[in-house]
């Protein structure tokens, strides 16, 4: 009996010694690593949590926030920390940020927290890396091609803009942020799954999506009643909806293929209207294109569509809300915008035209300055998640393999050594920068290299960047021609770190007669 008790107690007696040995080995490893690497200055903060709580503390979106400001002042533009439970190199350095993004897949790799993949899906473009990300991105670029931007997308961007603006009543007060979300969601739902604005199924999907989004930006606690738990439930509902659309579309494509086999050229002219609409739908939206031209699995298609709804709707709506906010405080910019767009409208009237075309878009020079400044000052995407694939040395500092790396885009955009009075909304700074530079075919301007990266860079440059700028330009065109607006109550954008208006950006509008 004594011998049995002795064997039972032995592991318990050895446990403190084993834990002490483990702690010693961890400390020894850390000491060796510090000796081996010349790490940037900084500190790790609390065990496990590190400095994450301070880093994520909300702050005014047009500033760096106390955490970044204090750390950059104390340690410089490259420092080390412990964020999201991992040792991290934080970069407010423009050159390092560009170096990180340009070396995607070679020295660095996209590495978002697991909770993001858990809610967006493992096949989401945001979390994919390597060949699979390249293939998914290729599909998105095809969907957002220059030819489609100039024709189908431009036409529908204007149609959906007017759908929203024409609902605004004289002297009414409403959330500009919600209206911007309505515009971008309706547009993406139309071009991804041919869903029309105002329809019951569109409104129901939008309602589920709002619940889903609250979970994406919440703490990943999968407990009943939490935002994350509700978001996972909404995700399941949204995926069932998309899958039902997929099955309907497969039947449409099958019928279309059968008709092409049976009907000859002379009979195609007599194709019924419903057949024509069905064929146009299977050709024009993303769901139809993916089903007809890719070999993606059902799970991959579901995650792709969900992630495109997220990426194509959320960030663009925030950018439009920011433009509305900045412009209401800058009457001079609104006046110059109005002159630019009145000139375009007069020229169209003389030609007997009403709808905007690509030539009109290319004439929106000052509008592009406003867009550039909105994205620079508002910083819709403030930082990116990356991981070092190899030991990397930069400016004498070492970035160890496996460490997380956070290129903080907003820190460069708000750097007073790179922008004069960076916390002020000044769209004219872009006219000064681009003096003598010609606009590109997309209406965008040459920018300040490393200093301006609102859409990221490198192989993961945002696939929807040109669509986002087109949406903003067309929305601004009709906004300044149709309305004056002002804040109905105090509000301003905060970084949580996602950018949001706490009160929804309530505005009062009056029509221009």
UniProtKB/Swiss-Prot annotation:
Pathway: Plant hormone biosynthesis; brassinosteroid biosynthesis. Its cofactor is heme. Gene3D superfamilies: Cytochrome P450 (1.10.630.10). It catalyses: a C27-steroid + reduced [NADPH--hemoprotein reductase] + O2 = a (22S)-22-hydroxy C27-steroid + oxidized [NADPH--hemoprotein reductase] + H2O + H(+); a C28-steroid + reduced [NADPH--hemoprotein reductase] + O2 = a (22S)-22-hydroxy C28-steroid + oxidized [NADPH--hemoprotein reductase] + H2O + H(+); a C29-steroid + reduced [NADPH--hemoprotein reductase] + O2 = a (22S)-22-hydroxy C29-steroid + oxidized [NADPH--hemoprotein reductase] + H2O + H(+); cholesterol + reduced [NADPH--hemoprotein reductase] + O2 = (22S)-22-hydroxycholesterol + oxidized [NADPH--hemoprotein reductase] + H2O + H(+). The chain crosses the membrane at residues 8-28. It comes from Arabidopsis thaliana. This is Steroid (22S)-hydroxylase. Pfam families: p450. Residues 252-277 are annotated as: Disordered. It is found in: Membrane. Its EC number is 1.14.14.178. Catalyzes the C22-alpha-hydroxylation step in brassinosteroids biosynthesis. Converts campesterol (CR) to (22S)-22-hydroxycampesterol (22-OHCR, 22-hydroxyCR), campestanol (CN) to 6-deoxycathasterone (6-deoxoCT), and 6-oxocampestanol (6-oxoCN) to cathasterone (CT). Can also use cholesterol and cholestanol as substrates. The gene is CYP90B1.
